[in-house]
Every structure is written in structure tokens, then in C-alpha cells.
From Swiss-Prot:
Interacts with Nipped-B to form the cohesin loading complex. Disulfide bonds: none annotated. Belongs to the SCC4/mau-2 family. This is MAU2 chromatid cohesion factor homolog. One of its GO terms (cellular component) is SMC loading complex. It is found in: Nucleus, Nucleoplasm. GO terms for biological process: cell division; chromosome segregation; maintenance of mitotic sister chromatid cohesion. It comes from Drosophila virilis. InterPro entries: MAU2 (IPR019440), TPR-like_helical_dom_sf (IPR011990). Keywords: Cell cycle, Cell division, Chromosome partition, Mitosis, Nucleus, Repeat, TPR repeat. TPR repeats lie at residues 96-129, 451-484, 491-524. Required for association of the cohesin complex with chromatin during interphase. Plays a role in sister chromatid cohesion and normal progression through prometaphase.
Length: 621
């Protein structure tokens, strides 16, 4: 009997020695992965017990996934680990770690259905282990969300919230509630989102004793609340929540704030973090940029974009997480529209090319698949602003066909309507306006986009010389824009209304409209309105025989025109201008002036698209 014990002890010593040696080689500088794998492989020659064998296969899979490109061998080891550990009792960490890693591996090889099947089985087996059950539910719901299977993701998160509640894990329950609210927001289930946010908000206020976890949850809650209001175009309503969010993130980023490891490391059921604080910091910048864009504060949007992009570059140097690329693309999408509003279209096309580069560089083209429609939309806006209307039309049509996002589709259709209006295609215009009207009658869309819809109808009526009808639509637009401080929509509506009054000979009302339009336009700044308004002012001053002011208005008009012409020349000479011809497949790689980070502030100004909308369409999940 003592001989058996001696042999077992000797084997144990061998296992420990080989594992120690493997870890030594793995953590060497630089790591010696070949020798690490050889040490782990040597363990199998001793015919170890099932649990040791399963754990070693898991470790082999982990090392191969982390340090090599040998996906097939990693899969073989993980599948071995799973087949051995699945029936074993009291072996949860190896069993479920293996399932989680195998699911990740299936995703890397674009086998989403295999990943879901693996995790569903693991979720079923983990019901007596709250930590793993919740972790696997979160992982599975994330995959369903990425595949746009939002109802399934939502159901899994509801199960997670119940499991956390049964285990008395309040912090974890709130994480599930907020994650579910995020999914419902993407689904546009407005009432359900409000109910969940209210429920989560009350728990955060009253039932989270740890002040650091409370502040962290508050940031998550406020990010969702701000995004909820912005998705509805409620720029004014959101201000108190945004201010609170900015204060909360400053608290979390303070030097005396404990690290995430300290806050979330004490209790296994509190080891769940939505985003680390450094990424939350970037996200708060991002929603602030979105708010500034919608409110019509282009300078602010540019300033915060530059800060966010600089922060992203710093984080990428530490660890290049995929979510940083998502943030970067969304920020670039926003800043592109800032440039076009201000008139710097040549810089806009450079930034579109930069967004394309980020998308192409992401693994498995995942980012390109998610943002292709937005890129087409941005190129459509650029083409439109440089008077390449045929290209713009095709870009918007590709966007409409590719996207499942209702707001992006509406935005592209409204810009298509403006193209049809400018190119005098009455039948196409009527068809698109009727379709937009039908689609949005029974749904609660963004205030900004619906205001834009009324604006386009007002523009259409103006072009038909139906001035009374134009006034009716534009007053509706102004009512919506003023209610939520949508400054760009207000200035566009005022300048068009001024033109309507000028056309019917009411110079007094025309002046009453164009004056605030120009004041707002210079604050934004929006050369589209400034160019239009200066032409109206020139005519009004001529009619009133005010030669001095007429001369000033004319000089301003010439200045804006010359800026546009100079920028147009730069655009057509840019290598990136070739992107206007991208209609399918991967975008072409263009070599031209590259983008320097942080982004430089625009110096020239122009835009021809009548309405703009932030490019974040619920894709922050």
C-alpha cells in the first residue's frame, strides 16, 4: 500500500513540477510558449486522473488561444477538456471556464450557432452555481445581441436578474436590469425601458450599501438615461442627466478612487463589471459629443471628440481592446458631420477614410459589417455636399438597404428626398415622402428626425410655390426644434421661412426670421445657413435701399462662396474622394493625406445637406 502512495506522491510531484515549469516559461520575458506547451504536453504521458487531465487540456487551450494562431489545436484541447469535465461533479471552474472559452473560440471562427449551443448547455448545467450561471447568461445574451436577436438576449438577461435576486446579489441584479434596458432601448420598447430604468434607479438609490459600487452603477444608469433621451431627440430634456453623468465620471476618475480590482474583487457575485472606468470615461465623452452635435454646438463636439480620441490612443497603448475601435468609429462618424456642417468637407472625407481603416482593421470584419451602412450614409452626405448627386443617391440607397436601424433609414430617406427635390424628380420625391409618413405614423421616432421630416415637407411646399403650406410645415418644425433646443433645425427652418416671406413680398417678417437664423448659424457655425441667409439679407437690404448693409451682406456671401469653392477644389483632388464610387463589398483602400490625432480644428466651412443627425444608432452594446 505504501508503494502505491509513494507512486501517487511521486506523480503529484511531477505534475506540480511540470505545471510550475510551464508557468515559468509562459511568464518569461519574452515568453517561451513552445517550451510551456511541451511541459503541459508531458503531463499526459503520466496518464493523470480525469480532473488533472481536464485541467491540463484547458490550460493547453488557454495558452494556444492567447499566444498562437493554432485555433484547431486549441479547439481539440478545449473539446477534450469539456468531454472529460462535463459529467464530473464539484468541478465547476474547469467545466464552465472551458465552455466559456470554447464559445469564444467558435465566435473567432464565425460559428455563432456553435457558441450559442455550447453556452446553452453550460447555462443548463450551472444552475446550482450562481456565479457561473450569471456569467454564462451574460456571455450568451451578448452573442444574441451581437446577432441582433434582441428578444432572446432580453429573455436571458431577465433570467439572470431573477437568479441574482434569489441569491441576494443586489449589485448583480441591477447590472442585469440595466443590461436588459440597453437591449430594450435598441428594440425601441420605450415604455419597457422607462419601467426598467425606474426600477433599477430606485434600487441603486436605496439598496446598494457600497458607495463605490453605487457610483459605478449610477454611471451605467445615467449613460443609458442620456442615450434614451438622445435617441428620442430630446436634447433639452437630457441636460440634467448629462450634467449628473459628467459629475459622476469625474468622481470615479479622481486619483483617490479605488481601483476596479479593489471595488469588485471581494465577493464573487460582485466580480462583474460592465466597462472598466477608463472605458466609461471615453463613453461619457462620446455621449457628450452626441449631445453637442444634436444641440448644434459644433465647436464643443470637436473639442470633446479630440479629447476622447486622445484618451482612446492612450488606452490602446496599454491594451488594444476591441471596444476602443467601436468608440473610435462612432466618434469619427460624429466628427465627420461636424466638419460638413462647418464646411470642411476635405477633412470630412479624410475622417471617413480613417473610420473605414478602423473598420477594416478589426478582426473578422465585424466592425465593418456593423458600420457599413453608416459609412455609406456619411459618404452620401459628403457626395451631396460636393454636388455629386448621383453618387449621393446611390450611397443613401445602399444605406437604406443595408440597415435595420429605423432612425438611420429615416435619416437616409430624408436626405434622398432633398436630392429628389433638388434634381426635380417629383414622382420619386412623392413616393419617398409617402413611405416615410406611413412608416412613422404609428411609431415614436426621434424628435430631431421628425422635425427634419416636417422641414423637408416645408422645403417641398416652398419649391412648389405653396407658401401657405410651407409656413404650416415650418412652424411645426420650429415648434419641435424650439421645444428641445435643436439649434441647427431651428436655424434651417428660420432661414427657409425667411425665404418664404421674401417670396410673398413680406420683407418685415422675412427680416424677423433671417436675423435670428444668422445669429444661430454663426454660433453653430453652419455655413449652409450663413450662405443662404446672406443672400436673403442682400436682397432685403436692396429692397429697403440700404446700400451699406447690402454691400456687407454681399461681401459675406462672397466670402462663404469662396470658402466653399476652395474646399470643393481640395475635395475633388483628394485621393479619398474615390470613396464616392464605393457601392458594394469592402470599401476601397485610398492613399491620401492621413488623419493626425488628435483631430485638428476645422478652419474652413460648408455643408449642403439640410439636416444632420448623430451617427450613434444604439450600437454601444
Amino acid at each position: 500500500m505504501s508503494g502505491v502512495n509513494t507512486t501517487a506522491a511521486s506523480q503529484d510531484a511531477c505534475y506540480i513540477s511540470l505545471l510550475g515549469l510551464a508557468e515559468y516559461f509562459r511568464t518569461s520575458q519574452p515568453p517561451n510558449i513552445k517550451k510551456c506547451i511541451q511541459c503541459l504536453q508531458a503531463l499526459f504521458t503520466f496518464q493523470p486522473p480525469s480532473k488533472v487531465e481536464a485541467r491540463t487540456h484547458l490550460q493547453m487551450g488557454q495558452v494556444l488561444m492567447a499566444y498562437t494562431r493554432n485555433i484547431d489545436l486549441a479547439r481539440q484541447h478545449l473539446e477534450q477538456a469539456w468531454s472529460i469535465s462535463e459529467p464530473l461533479m464539484n468541478f465547476d471552474d474547469v467545466k464552465f471556464d472551458t465552455a466559456s472559452l470554447l464559445a469564444q473560440l467558435h465566435l473567432q471562427t464565425e460559428q455563432s450557432s456553435h457558441a450559442k449551443a455550447m453556452l446553452r448547455r453550460a447555462v443548463e448545467l450551472s444552475q446550482n452555481n450562481v456565479y457561473w450561471h450569471c456569467k454564462l447568461l451574460l456571455q450568451l445574451s451578448q452573442i444574441h445581441a451581437n446577432d441582433r436577436e434582441y428578444s432572446l438576449a432580453s429573455d436571458l438577461l431577465a433570467v439572470g436578474a431573477e437568479s441574482a435576486e434569489e441569491a441576494g446579489a443586489t449589485y448583480l441584479k441591477v447590472l442585469f436590469l440595466l443590461s436588459r434596458a440597453m437591449i430594450l432601448m435598441i428594440e425601441r420598447k420605450t415604455n419597457d425601458v422607462l419601467a426598467l430604468l425606474n426600477s433599477a434607479g430606485q434600487i441603486i438609490d436605496n439598496n446598494i450599501p457600497n458607495p463605490h459600487q453605487k457610483e459605478y452603477l449610477k454611471v451605467f444608469f445615467l449613460v443609458l438615461q442620456v442615450c434614451y433621451y438622445l435617441a428620442l431627440g430630446q436634447v433639452k430634456t437630457v441636460k440634467p442627466s448629462l450634467k449628473q453623468l459628467q459629475m459622476s465620471i469625474q468622481t470615479i476618475m479622481a486619483p483617490n478612487w479605488p481601483s476596479d480590482e479593489v471595488i469588485f474583487g471581494a465577493n464573487q457575485l460582485e466580480m462583474f463589471v460592465w466597462l472598466p472606468k477608463e472605458q466609461l470615461y471615453v463613453l461619457v465623452y462620446l455621449v457628450t459629443v452626441s449631445h453637442s452635435m444634436m444641440a448644434g454646438y459644433m465647436d464643443k463636439a470637436q473639442k470633446y471628440t479630440e479629447k476622447a480620441l486622445t484618451q482612446i490612443e492612450k488606452l490602446k497603448l496599454q491594451e488594444d481592446k476591441s471596444i476602443l475601435s467601436v468608440f473610435k468609429v462612432i466618434l469619427l462618424e460624429h466628427i465627420v458631420m461636424c466638419r460638413m456642417v462647418m464646411g470642411n468637407r476635405e477633412l470630412a472625407i479624410r475622417e471617413i477614410a480613417a473610420a473605414r481603416d478602423v473598420c477594416i482593421a478589426a478582426p473578422h470584419r465585424n466592425l465593418l459589417k456593423r458600420h457599413s451602412a453608416q459609412l455609406h450614409c456619411l459618404i452620401g452626405l459628403y457626395s451631396m455636399s460636393t454636388s455629386f448627386f448621383e453618387h449621393a443617391e446611390r450611397q443613401f440607397l445602399v444605406c437604406v438597404n443595408e440597415t435595420g436601424e429605423r432612425d438611420l433609414k429615416l435619416f437616409a430617406n430624408l436626405n434622398l428626398a432633398i436630392i429628389y427635390l433638388r434634381t426635380k424628380r417629383e414622382a420619386d420625391l412623392k413616393q419617398i415622402l409617402d413611405a416615410v409618413s406611413t412608416e412613422n405614423t404609428h411609431t415614436y421616432s426621434s424628435q430631431a428626425l421628425m422635425g427634419g421630416f416636417y422641414y423637408v415637407q416645408g422645403l417641398h411646399a416652398f419649391h412648389k410655390n405653396s407658401f401657405h403650406e410651407a409656413k404650416r410645415f415650418l412652424r411645426e418644425t420650429l415648434k419641435m426644434a424650439n421645444a428641445e433646443d435643436l439649434n441647427r433645425l431651428t436655424s434651417c427652418s428660420l432661414v427657409l421661412l425667411s425665404h418664404v416671406f421674401l417670396s410673398i413680398g413680406n420683407s418685415k417678417e422675412s427680416m424677423n426670421m433671417v436675423t435670428p437664423a444668422m445669429q444661430l448659424a454663426s454660433k453653430i457655425p453652419d455655413i449652409h445657413v450663413q450662405l443662404w441667409g446672406s443672400a436673403i439679407l442682400k436682397d432685403l437690404h436692396r429692397m429697403s435701399k440700404d446700400a451699406q448693409h447690402e454691400k456687407e451682406a454681399y461681401a459675406n456671401h462672397v466670402k462663404y462662396s469662396e470658402n466653399l469653392i476652395a474646399d470643393q477644389r481640395k475635395c475633388v483632388q483628394s485621393a479619398h474622394h474615390e470613396l464616392v464610387n464605393w457601392f458594394q463589398g469592402d470599401p476601397p483602400v485610398t492613399s491620401g493625406a492621413s488623419l493626425n490625432l488628435p483631430v485638428a480644428v476645422a478652419t474652413t466651412e460648408a455643408s449642403t445637406s439640410a439636416i444632420q443627425q448623430p451617427a450613434q444608432f444604439g450600437q454601444f452594446y
